[in-house]
Amino acid sequence: MSFASASINLTHHFLIAMPGLEDAAFARSVVYLCEHSERGALGLIINKPTDITLKGLFDKVDLSLRREDLGREPVFQGGPVQTERGFVLHEPMPDEGRSATDGSAYASTMVIPGGLAMTTSKDVLEALSTGAGPRRVLITLGYSSWGGGQLESELAENAWLTVAADLSVIFDTPAPERYDRALSLLGLEVWMLSPSAGHA
């Protein structure tokens, strides 16, 4: 059964780029999939830091950042789409999962089945600036997206490996080690892969 014909849902999974994936935006990338359905997929690259720190980002949007533990953390390159827009991947706040009109913590939050949330509204940055807000965050500029059937085609062409997401890779593993750490979830190391390898 091919990926194109199988009904799969890879929400809350990692996509791990195979060595043969030559697109510069995705080479050696680990993508956390926030959403995957028959309409397409949306994810954030979690292992490609930019030169911008969170303190620099907060300065740019005229907010102070009281949490010193976050100030030196990098902003990540989340993907090639809307690279001027920020995306905050974080642990859900206690009242998320309700719509904004029902009192959700932030104006624009997607609660991801599996234990994370992604917020695109500035209010999450405002909460972080005061020392409130989510405890653990990863902030990207831009995101990655695939149209309906596009990701399935790339999987069938062996462009990606997939594995259920492990939050420790996102929040507890240094960025340069995330690719190898994600592979280790499959029991693999980089030297075991070849550009023409199949699916794990």
From Swiss-Prot:
InterPro entries cross-referenced by the UniProt entry: AlgH-like
Cellular component, GO annotation: cytosol
Matching Pfam families: DUF179
Family annotation (SUPFAM superfamilies): VC0467-like
Family classification: Belongs to the UPF0301 (AlgH) family.
PANTHER family: UNCHARACTERIZED PROTEIN YQGE, UPF0301 PROTEIN YQGE
Protein name as catalogued: UPF0301 protein Veis_1517
Natural source organism: Verminephrobacter eiseniae (strain EF01-2)
